[in-house]
A protein has these predicted regions:
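Active-site metal-binding loops of divalent metal-dependent hydrolases
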Residues: 38-41, 71, 98, 120
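Metal-dependent catalytic neighborhoods of phosphoester/phosphodiester hydrolases
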Residues: 77-87, 102-106
Protein backbone atom coordinates (compact mmCIF):
# COMPACT_ATOMS: atom_id res chain seq x y z
CA UNK A 1 0.00 0.00 0.00
CA UNK A 2 1.05 3.58 -0.61
CA UNK A 3 1.91 5.52 2.61
CA UNK A 4 -1.10 7.82 2.05
CA UNK A 5 -3.37 4.78 2.45
CA UNK A 6 -2.12 4.38 6.04
CA UNK A 7 -2.30 8.05 6.97
CA UNK A 8 -4.42 8.55 10.09
CA UNK A 9 -6.83 11.43 9.47
CA UNK A 10 -8.33 13.07 12.59
CA UNK A 11 -12.10 13.58 12.79
CA UNK A 12 -13.08 16.74 10.90
CA UNK A 13 -9.82 16.87 8.94
CA UNK A 14 -8.93 15.98 5.35
CA UNK A 15 -5.72 14.47 4.02
CA UNK A 16 -4.53 15.62 0.58
CA UNK A 17 -1.77 14.10 -1.55
CA UNK A 18 -0.56 15.26 -4.99
CA UNK A 19 0.39 12.53 -7.48
CA UNK A 20 1.69 14.74 -10.34
CA UNK A 21 -0.07 16.29 -13.32
CA UNK A 22 -3.52 17.16 -11.96
CA UNK A 23 -4.06 14.03 -9.87
CA UNK A 24 -4.83 14.35 -6.18
CA UNK A 25 -6.05 11.98 -3.49
CA UNK A 26 -8.34 13.12 -0.68
CA UNK A 27 -8.88 11.03 2.44
CA UNK A 28 -11.22 11.58 5.37
CA UNK A 29 -11.27 10.18 8.91
CA UNK A 30 -13.71 7.42 7.90
CA UNK A 31 -11.28 6.04 5.32
CA UNK A 32 -13.00 7.30 2.18
CA UNK A 33 -10.33 7.86 -0.45
CA UNK A 34 -11.25 10.01 -3.45
CA UNK A 35 -8.86 10.13 -6.39
CA UNK A 36 -9.30 13.34 -8.41
CA UNK A 37 -8.43 13.25 -12.12
CA UNK A 38 -6.15 10.20 -11.98
CA UNK A 39 -3.77 10.22 -14.94
CA UNK A 40 -1.23 7.42 -14.67
CA UNK A 41 -0.49 6.22 -18.23
CA UNK A 42 2.14 3.52 -18.57
CA UNK A 43 3.39 4.82 -21.94
CA UNK A 44 5.48 7.76 -20.71
CA UNK A 45 7.73 9.30 -23.38
CA UNK A 46 10.56 11.35 -21.85
CA UNK A 47 9.60 14.46 -23.82
CA UNK A 48 6.17 14.51 -22.12
CA UNK A 49 6.81 13.08 -18.64
CA UNK A 50 9.32 13.87 -15.91
CA UNK A 51 9.15 10.34 -14.47
CA UNK A 52 9.53 7.15 -16.51
CA UNK A 53 6.95 5.34 -14.36
CA UNK A 54 3.58 6.39 -12.88
CA UNK A 55 3.78 7.91 -9.38
CA UNK A 56 1.52 5.22 -7.88
CA UNK A 57 0.13 1.78 -8.64
CA UNK A 58 -3.66 2.11 -8.56
CA UNK A 59 -3.92 -1.08 -6.48
CA UNK A 60 -1.77 0.56 -3.76
CA UNK A 61 -4.57 2.95 -2.73
CA UNK A 62 -7.91 1.74 -1.32
CA UNK A 63 -9.93 3.94 -3.69
CA UNK A 64 -13.61 4.41 -2.82
CA UNK A 65 -14.41 7.19 -5.30
CA UNK A 66 -12.95 8.79 -8.42
CA UNK A 67 -13.85 12.39 -9.24
CA UNK A 68 -13.36 13.47 -12.85
CA UNK A 69 -13.47 17.24 -13.35
CA UNK A 70 -13.77 17.31 -17.14
CA UNK A 71 -13.16 15.30 -20.30
CA UNK A 72 -9.58 16.05 -21.27
CA UNK A 73 -7.25 13.07 -21.69
CA UNK A 74 -5.26 13.97 -18.58
CA UNK A 75 -8.41 14.21 -16.44
CA UNK A 76 -10.58 11.38 -17.82
CA UNK A 77 -8.10 8.63 -18.69
CA UNK A 78 -9.70 5.27 -19.58
CA UNK A 79 -6.40 3.38 -19.22
CA UNK A 80 -6.04 4.50 -15.60
CA UNK A 81 -9.75 4.03 -14.86
CA UNK A 82 -9.66 0.43 -16.12
CA UNK A 83 -6.82 -0.39 -13.71
CA UNK A 84 -8.65 1.30 -10.83
CA UNK A 85 -11.78 -0.71 -11.62
CA UNK A 86 -9.84 -3.99 -11.71
CA UNK A 87 -8.25 -3.25 -8.33
CA UNK A 88 -11.30 -1.61 -6.68
CA UNK A 89 -14.45 -2.77 -8.54
CA UNK A 90 -16.81 -1.11 -6.05
CA UNK A 91 -15.26 2.36 -6.44
CA UNK A 92 -17.74 4.97 -7.66
CA UNK A 93 -16.84 7.27 -10.56
CA UNK A 94 -18.30 10.79 -10.44
CA UNK A 95 -18.04 13.40 -13.17
CA UNK A 96 -19.68 15.51 -15.86
CA UNK A 97 -21.82 13.77 -18.48
CA UNK A 98 -19.05 13.86 -21.13
CA UNK A 99 -16.60 12.09 -18.82
CA UNK A 100 -19.15 9.53 -17.64
CA UNK A 101 -20.18 8.74 -21.22
CA UNK A 102 -16.52 8.08 -22.04
CA UNK A 103 -16.16 5.90 -18.93
CA UNK A 104 -19.22 3.84 -19.90
CA UNK A 105 -18.08 3.32 -23.50
CA UNK A 106 -14.32 2.85 -23.00
CA UNK A 107 -14.08 0.91 -19.73
CA UNK A 108 -15.78 -2.02 -17.99
CA UNK A 109 -17.31 0.32 -15.39
CA UNK A 110 -21.11 0.06 -15.41
CA UNK A 111 -23.71 2.79 -14.92
CA UNK A 112 -24.43 1.56 -11.39
CA UNK A 113 -20.94 2.66 -10.36
CA UNK A 114 -21.16 6.13 -11.92
CA UNK A 115 -22.78 9.43 -10.98
CA UNK A 116 -23.19 12.41 -13.30
CA UNK A 117 -22.64 15.86 -11.83
CA UNK A 118 -23.36 19.24 -13.40
CA UNK A 119 -22.45 22.83 -12.66
CA UNK A 120 -25.02 24.81 -10.77
Amino acid sequence: MHPFAHLNIPQGALGIHWFEQNAYALKDSQGHLVLVDPYFPHDRPAERFVRPTPPVDEAALPITHVLLTHQHGDHTNPETLRRIHRAWPEAKVIGPIESIQQVLTETEIDAGHTTVIAAG
